[in-house]
Amino acid sequence: MKKLTIAAIAASMMATAIPASADLAIPLLSYRTGPYAPNGIPYADGVTDYLNMINARDGGVGGEMIKILECETGYNTTKGVECYEATKGEGALVYFPLSTGITYQLIPKATADDIPIHSMGYGRTSAANGKVFSHVFNFPGTYWDAASIIVKHMMDMENGSLDGKKIALVYHNSAYGKEPIRTLQELSAKHGFELVLLPVDHPGQEQKSTWLQVRKEKPDFVTMWGWGV
């Protein structure tokens, strides 16, 4: 009896020492509600469907199932930070906020917590400098890249020169919308075009005055930098 008891205790200790297979926790900071839901819903659905497919088709990754930690932000920066704090303790592997404002706020937090951020083509452009921002990855491009590509396309349309042209930027009046301004200002000085800045405040339902200004300015090109506005 004594031997059986000792054996049972030993078996129990071994079972405790061997960790159970843990889920791979991937937070999904979604916005299915609010003025930007038309963009947020298909994105959240797509990410969810893809990760569920990986679980169903491949049995997860390396034999470990993916656990989706969805948290609704409403595209609100404060709520986004709250979602980060609520999910990071679940063993979060990576964050992809799909919001420049939220990304800005999470960079110092995630860096301190040693959790990577993948802000694919959005977020803080300067985070592309990995020597300074060790935990942020914004490949394959940045807002500055996008602004440069847009201007290059306009130049191609104008036989290689924008000298004397007027370009209006109708942009979302937020961290996201302001990202290309510096690049466009530099390119304006370089290529000789006039840059007209026309902000549209959140959530973008009222734009009449903006387009009246566009009519008044009579730009050669109008670039829309919005997120559903």
Each model region followed by its residue ranges:
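Beta-alpha junction/loop-to-helix N-cap segments that form part of ligand/metal-binding clefts
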Residues: 25, 38-45, 57-129, 139, ...
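Short beta-strand segments enriched in small/hydrophobic residues
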Residues: 23-43, 98, 166-172
